Amino acid sequence: DVEPLLGFLSPKSGQENEVDDFPYKGQGELXXGIVEQCCHKPCNIFDLQNYCN
């Protein structure tokens, strides 16, 4: 259950509020790591879980 974790997330961390940094799909996906994805901009719990699996 992710409900208790929602308090730790930024208000902009939901998928509906995401803004793509790269206008062309796939442009930024080649060298994206956890730092680029979750430190330089907010990420959601699902993005974090992808790095733990």
Curated annotation (Swiss-Prot):
It is found in: Secreted. Disulfide bonds join 38-43. Keywords: Carbohydrate metabolism, Disulfide bond, Glucose metabolism, Hormone, Secreted. GO terms for biological process: glucose metabolic process. It holds the Pfam family Insulin. One of its GO terms (molecular function) is hormone activity. GO terms for cellular component: extracellular space. Signal peptide: none annotated. Residues 1-30 form a propeptide. PROSITE patterns: INSULIN. InterPro entries: Insulin, Insulin-like, Insulin-like_sf, Insulin_CS. Heterodimer of a B chain and an A chain linked by two disulfide bonds. Insulin decreases blood glucose concentration. It increases cell permeability to monosaccharides, amino acids and fatty acids. It accelerates glycolysis, the pentose phosphate cycle, and glycogen synthesis in liver. Belongs to the insulin family. This is Insulin.
